Amino acid sequence: METDYLTIKEAGQHELEIKKSRFIADVGRVITEEEAQAFIAGVIAREPKATHHCWAYVLGEHDEIQRESDNGEPSGTAGVPILTVLKRNDLHNAITVVTRYFGGIKLGAGGLIRAYSNATSTGVEATGVVRLVRQRELTLTVSYPLYDRLAHYLTENAISVLDTAYTDAVAVTIAVDLDAVTPTQDAITNLLSNQFTVKEGPVAYHEVPVEIHASNR
């Protein structure tokens, strides 16, 4: 992808009980269809006695790949609600498998839609969401007497420090949003009276935590 996007923080699981049926949401981050199918297969292997394994995933820079399955539930009552929650929360390269153990009470079409939607949204919220931001890595090398001043500036401005190496000087590798590279370098130049060196590194995605109250509406 060439843009920043929201996705699942890490693989996680959350369970709900609705009218004696257990709904277990497994949420994860996937990049390819092969990874998505392997994720689904892993859940099925872990829960072989479940009544249903319903799932959905979205992949690609523009969500070009969207798949869902009701896995035996009435058409449109499981896979589509799961997919809808992922899309309404603007999640990309994300998957959810909701495993159901039938508890003996039928929920009806509307009840199933609400159950699978709620299982997905609470699973996403419990697992967590991050924004993947394209940032430039910069390695700043300063003398020991100036290091504390630099470290304070980075902390005060919430700039992510990826690595710090201590040799005859201190080399600090930071990650900066692409549109902030020049302003950041200018600010540090003024702060340290140009008594440092900078080496530009690659552009890479870095995770920024996001607070989310997942929506299923």
Regions found by a protein language model. Give the residues of each.
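C-terminal regulatory domains involved in ligand/effector binding and gene-expression control
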Residues: 1-76, 197-209, 213-217
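Terminal, non-globular segments
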Residues: 174-183
